[in-house]
Amino acid sequence: MLAAKLSGKVIQNINSTFVGGGVAEILSRMIPLVGQLGVDVRWNVIKGSNEFFQVTKKFHNALHARQERITSEDFARFQETTQKNIDELELYGDILFIHDPQPIGLIARKKDMGKKWIWRCHIDISHPNQTVWDFLLPFVAQYDAAVFSAPAFSTELPIRQFLISPSIDPLSDKNKELSPRTIDSVLVKYGIPRDKPIITQISRFDYLKDPVGVISAFELVKKNVDCRLVFAGSTASDDPESNEVLAQVRERAGNNPDIHILLSPPGNDIEINALQRASTIIVQKSLSEGFGLTVSEALWKEKPVVASAVGGIPLQIINKFTGLLSHGIPGTAYAIKQLLANPEYAKWLGKNGREHVKHNFLITRHLKDYLLLYIFLDHQADIINL
């Protein structure tokens, strides 16, 4: 019914990479599903040098309020690469869905193309570095609408804003049910015994995910409870910093036989699924966060989760009901120890978490929200403001 209202329209998604990171993962699941409803949805990526993506990584960190040294040369490189993509990238959608800051400057084409333009911001810009935000705001102001993942992420804008939380696909390789044999085979592959509780964090190798802090929290837990840590992550083609973070994490872990640092290539979803299902507790100790869908992935598997109270995580973790929210290294360690000491409580949290995800963070709800957004932009004359 909703999809029929978009008959004949082309929706063009543009971001900075086909693989690695939450945006690419969401698009890879969402676009085929929308297509099955008869809506013409396509996906393109911008091109950029390693130097360009170093600049956009600085922007990303600065928008998350991390201190970064950003120079006039950085802004000039961003403008130069943006102009090159404006000149070379074919833009043809009736609705152009631009994801995050990297391709934001493509809005310059609106003057000659017209059409409807949406800026989909997947990150928290509520307390941005003001210099970077002052640079990006003139681009944002030209869009027809902006979409944020959580109410706390947004800021005052001269355009319409919409709230659409991201989602997981329960039938994807990362979330579907797995046989015990499959789970065991992954543990054997990576040399992870099941002789003690397994504490796991799944995330990109990114300073904002605080992998070194995860190791520190684990060491505090291990003083009281014998357990092992698995940190499985990937790198992304638009994140040049990730290899540097990986090296630091490996150095911090040293030769501790109870710490397993795994580099999992993008698309290795069944193994990630298996690692989550084999875990006793899932951790997401982010310093800053977009939405943090690894939390919903874990909750869907009925796993007890300890996660930082940042970004979109508090929308997924209702403290002491669907998981435990934590603050800092000691707080994370305390929450993990609490769950290890109370397995029935941990199990109860996991069951509540699955129900919460079922009703709020599955792809079917996400799909409906996007269709309603597209229809709104395409039929604005029918909207009545009360």
Language model feature labels by segment:
Residues 338, 345-360, 366, 372-376:
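A short, well-ordered alpha-helix in the C-terminal region of glycosyltransferases
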Residues 319-330, 338-343:
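Conserved acidic donor-binding segment of nucleotide-sugar-dependent glycosyltransferases
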Residues 287:
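Aromatic "clamp/platform" in nucleotide-sugar-dependent glycosyltransferases that forms part
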Residues 304-307, 317:
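Short hydrophobic beta-strand element within catalytic cores of glycosyltransferases
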Residues 273, 296-300, 314-315, 321:
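Short alpha-helical segment that forms part of, or immediately flanks, the ligand-binding pocket
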Residues 12, 187-209, 215, 229-230:
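Conserved donor-binding/catalytic core segment of Leloir-type glycosyltransferases
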Residues 280, 302, 309:
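A short alpha->beta transition loop at the rim of the catalytic pocket in nucleotide-sugar-dependent
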Residues 233, 237, 241-274:
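Nucleotide-activated donor-binding/catalytic signature segment of Leloir-type glycosyltransferases, i.e.
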